[in-house]
Amino acid sequence: MIEADRLIAASGRDREEVQDRAIRPLSLDEYIGQPVVREQMALFIQAARGRGESLDHTLIFGPPGLGKTTLANIIAHEMGVSVKSTSGPILERPGDLAAMLTNLEPHDVLFIDEIHRLSPVVEEVLYPAMEDFQLDIMIGEGPAARSIKLDLPPFTLVGATTRAGMLTNPLRDRFGIVQRLEFYNDKDLSTIVSRSANILGLAIEDQGAYEIARRARGTPRIANRLLRRVRDYAEVRGKGQITKAVADMALNLLDVDERGFDHSDRRLLLTMIEKFDGGPVGVDNLAAAISEERHTIEDVLEPYLIQQGYIMRTPRGRVVTRHAYLHFGLNIPGRLGEGGDFSEPGDE
């Protein structure tokens, strides 16, 4: 199974990039959710513009699909400058980075997605560019090689990553602003769904938007993807209007349940419960039982289930929690305890 094949995958798809561009917010006023990040960035941007300076280099990290690219574009828009975009894997040689840096105008934004994947040799070139706005490049080869310095216009590097822990300390320390994006709550996601529907010219009720939002795993990219699929259902079977009932029927047809789980999530949980008595079970045994690769379980399936409190990692292996039994309407084993709060995660 490939992550991008799943309807609820947080990673982006090439065609979606074009579709999402039409519904992306362009300013902080349009930006929904992440209140702390929004307030801080508004303050930093206003201060930088007031001084006539470029914004400090900014690192944005968090799970995929939460709007890191969107925020980078908003920063450029609010600063009134252009944004040049690239990604870590694309910048293979120092010359690739040098070409982008030398084409920047004063105060422009250079956005590097997946910045944790920069090669060490490219990263070394980036250090003086970030710190001193200078580019050190080598001319010639062998004994005749010499280093020259090129002055760069002041610019803002905005780096985005899903794995902040993989950044080297020297690179991380050169960012003056560091922002973490959190998963969205259902209310903010519902507002995002309603806004996207309005831009796309769709008729949607508030309850319909909320039904989509609560199954979107706290991720705007997934919410917008589900909205497009529910739109298809509404146009064919729902008279074009997205109500709560239409959204519920569409998402059930798409095999996305009320917790945002799909078939793969449920199969993993049920396998642990039915074949391994809830665990502990080693990841290799689990991979063999559900015919998946080990890395698929570790990188694709597990993270959301752990974050939502349905699976725990222990020294002896993976264990399901009482919430997994409750989700499927199963009796909770006595070893998990009879007392305490048996509500599912997220319930009040």
From Swiss-Prot:
GO biological process: DNA recombination; DNA repair
Cited InterPro entries: AAA+_ATPase, AAA_lid_4, DNA_helicase_Holl-junc_RuvB, P-loop_NTPase, RuvB-like_N, RuvB_C, WH-like_DNA-bd_sf, WH_DNA-bd_sf
Residue numbers binding Mg(2+): T69
Compartments (UniProt record): Cytoplasm
Any single Gene Ontology cellular-component annotation: cytoplasm
Residue positions binding ATP: I23, R24, G65, K68, T69, T70, E131, D132, F133, R174, Y184, R221
Membrane-spanning residues: none
Assigned EC number: 3.6.4.-
Keyword DNA damage: yes
Region called Large ATPase domain (RuvB-L), residue ranges: 4-184
The reaction(s) this protein catalyses: ATP + H2O = ADP + phosphate + H(+)
Residue ranges, annotated region (Small ATPAse domain (RuvB-S)): 185-255
Sequence positions that bind DNA: R294, R313, R318
Gene3D superfamilies: 1.10.8.60, P-loop containing nucleotide triphosphate hydrolases (3.40.50.300), Winged helix-like DNA-binding domain superfamily/Winged helix DNA-binding domain (1.10.10.10)
Predominant subcellular localization, coarse grouping: cytoplasm
Segments for region (Head domain (RuvB-H)): 258-348
SMART domains, per the entry: AAA
Cited SUPFAM superfamilies: P-loop containing nucleoside triphosphate hydrolases, Winged helix' DNA-binding domain
Keywords: ATP-binding, Cytoplasm, DNA damage, DNA recombination, DNA repair, DNA-binding, Hydrolase, Nucleotide-binding
Domain comment (free text): Has 3 domains, the large (RuvB-L) and small ATPase (RuvB-S) domains and the C-terminal head (RuvB-H) domain. The head domain binds DNA, while the ATPase domains jointly bind ATP, ADP or are empty depending on the state of the subunit in the translocation cycle. During a single DNA translocation step the structure of each domain remains the same, but their relative positions change.
UniProt family annotation: Belongs to the RuvB family.
Subunit structure: Homohexamer. Forms an RuvA(8)-RuvB(12)-Holliday junction (HJ) complex. HJ DNA is sandwiched between 2 RuvA tetramers; dsDNA enters through RuvA and exits via RuvB. An RuvB hexamer assembles on each DNA strand where it exits the tetramer. Each RuvB hexamer is contacted by two RuvA subunits (via domain III) on 2 adjacent RuvB subunits; this complex drives branch migration. In the full resolvosome a probable DNA-RuvA(4)-RuvB(12)-RuvC(2) complex forms which resolves the HJ.
Main function: The RuvA-RuvB-RuvC complex processes Holliday junction (HJ) DNA during genetic recombination and DNA repair, while the RuvA-RuvB complex plays an important role in the rescue of blocked DNA replication forks via replication fork reversal (RFR). RuvA specifically binds to HJ cruciform DNA, conferring on it an open structure. The RuvB hexamer acts as an ATP-dependent pump, pulling dsDNA into and through the RuvAB complex. RuvB forms 2 homohexamers on either side of HJ DNA bound by 1 or 2 RuvA tetramers; 4 subunits per hexamer contact DNA at a time.
NCBIfam families: PRK00080.1, ruvB
Name of this protein: Holliday junction branch migration complex subunit RuvB
